Amino acid sequence: MSSKPKPIEIIGAPFSKGQPRGGVEKGPAALRKAGLVEKLKETEYNVRDHGDLAFVDVPNDSPFQIVKNPRSVGKANEQLAAVVAETQKNGTISVVLGGDHSMAIGSISGHARVHPDLCVIWVDAHTDINTPLTTSSGNLHGQPVAFLLKELKGKFPDVPGFSWVTPCISAKDIVYIGLRDVDPGEHYIIKTLGIKYFSMTEVDKLGIGKVMEETFSYLLGRKKRPIHLSFDVDGLDPVFTPATGTPVVGGLSYREGLYITEEIYKTGLLSGLDIMEVNPTLGKTPEEVTRTVNTAVALTLSCFGTKREGNHKPETDYLKPPK
């Protein structure tokens, strides 16, 4: 790490219209209530909380074909992109608290305006790469990557609310980790475009250590560049993050999640982070909500240097009694 790391700006994105379930807009508040901001301030980073973005309802937001709430999702992402771009311009790491994963469109678009050479690590049970034509649900939280990829430009009609979006990443700039629920159309896209992925099968076969090694070699082998980590908490097994909208059994363990974030921290290249799909209203018990939120907090802290082996302040001699 450089002697003084970049500051962090926390941006709340309390948005739920990329999917049908209420409650995910309460994610940012739940993460803050669990002490995320205070705990981040205990790290080596300077932390500023931008607060939550205020999203206004778009009236008469009728579906586009089967795509639901297109104008609301498009407008909210446009707002988020502007704030993230401003944050990045100031040399700050953007930390977006979701909110549903459709907000990655704005988060990554805004980040790429300032760092067009960025790469994306997408941790998720799902690829979120359905297009408005391949989606069977019409929910935009299953489509953000399709809007971001240059190779899919022109492969689906213009969706109202998204005229501002310019695809900003190539198929070779993204790696998926944790996949285990991929639609046929999505599978066709990732195979056809040659997108690098580590489904749970690869995680089982290689182990998470090798997965991260290969991820970095693939994305950073030729040139070091900024990393955008987009982390859907459903990437982890529902044992650890039950309070989320689309849980899928057989996911990453708590330990594997922390290993991913510890390794990303060690590169010194993390430049943008999304912590998405925490839905405090979906836990079957209060304990399930707490477990999900605390896991999301732990993953975030790990991105900024909190290690399982422990931490100590470099300038302190802990064997000297305090005066």
From Swiss-Prot:
The keyword Metal-binding applies. Pfam families: Arginase. Residues 1-27 are annotated as: Disordered. Its EC number is 3.5.3.1. The keyword Repeat does not apply. It comes from the Eukaryota. It is found in: Cytoplasm; Cytoplasmic granule. One of its GO terms (biological process) is mammary gland involution. Its main location: cytoplasm. The modification Phosphothreonine is found at T281. Key element of the urea cycle converting L-arginine to urea and L-ornithine, which is further metabolized into metabolites proline and polyamides that drive collagen synthesis and bioenergetic pathways critical for cell proliferation, respectively; the urea cycle takes place primarily in the liver and, to a lesser extent, in the kidneys. Belongs to the arginase family. Homotrimer. Interacts with CMTM6. This is Arginase-1. It comes from Rattus norvegicus.
